[in-house]
């Protein structure tokens, strides 16, 4: 996929801010490039990152039999979480080749490779047949859709 200028700006943002995510978000262990969800059970920022995934998964009623599209998967954090926590199959797509490679490595390290598949693709212009997925997951990534209606 040849990135457009708009896509390249998104890719560049994450490349430039990667060190901040590594430091503040403990990216190497959390795989999260999103904010957390705080309630009375959460005691740390790290827990809040996991809680965000839990709340979204419960709200979406994701089941082990579901096929999930993680639209804007970053380094694979939510995809890996869903595969581990629920056991569903997840396809994660990102604009960034660097994030793709990190997601593949992260999935390998967490032993969820059979359940996850990562690709470089624009979530507003996929090549997936209609109705390929039961759930479309977008944790703090949909804001980057150039055309929200097309998304």
Where are these regions (language model features)?
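Class I SAM-dependent methyltransferase SAM/SAH-binding core
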Residues: 67-69, 75-125
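Conserved hydrophobic/aromatic pocket- or pore-lining residues that grip, position, or stack substrates
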Residues: 14, 56, 96
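N-terminal auxiliary segments of SAM/dcSAM-dependent transferases
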Residues: 1-24
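A short acidic, Gly/Pro-enriched loop at the edge of an enzyme's catalytic core
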Residues: 124-135
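A short, conserved alpha-helix within the catalytic core of class I
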Residues: 144-151
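Short coil/turn segments at secondary-structure boundaries
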Residues: 24-30
